[in-house]
Amino acid sequence: MIYVDADACPVKPEVLKVAERHGLEVTFVANSGLRPSRDPMVRNVIVSNAFDAADNWIAERAGAGDVVVTADVPLAVRCVATGAFVSGPTGRVFDETNIGMASAMRDLGAHLRETGESKGYNASFSPKDRSRFLETFDRLCRRAKSLAGETGGRP
């Protein structure tokens, strides 16, 4: 199963393309604005506007062998802890070897913004980011399918 933190996710078309190629189900989770799909392998879940509602929905369901796409580091922390494969929309993989540093850097950035030491700018999403995401996401989907085959479970 693929879970996508879909609010402001710039790689939804890429997720669909790779998921279709691998025959994997996709669940897009957002608090508004999802385009309906007729594809039986695609599910849209609209959650409340409550703080972290989409993150909580995904974290409560994602488990070992699932693939999660999110730019939200706290959600990535929760999903990595369950054994899910996690990628950001720029192709950055979050795993047990780097999630602690990613979380610390996020917290440091938040602190610097609060104290006025940083303006908190985010780089724009580039074609290179999209390409890197496609490569990373395809690799994670293959790993998820391989794990499902080894354990007899669903990807």
From Swiss-Prot:
Task: List the coiled-coil residues.
Answer: none
A Pfam family matched by this chain, by name?
DUF188
Which family does the UniProt entry place this protein in?
A: Belongs to the UPF0178 family.
PANTHER family attached to this UniProt entry? UPF0178 PROTEIN YAII
Q: This protein is called what?
A: UPF0178 protein RHE_CH02229
Which source organism? Rhizobium etli (strain ATCC 51251 / DSM 11541 / JCM 21823 / NBRC 15573 / CFN 42)
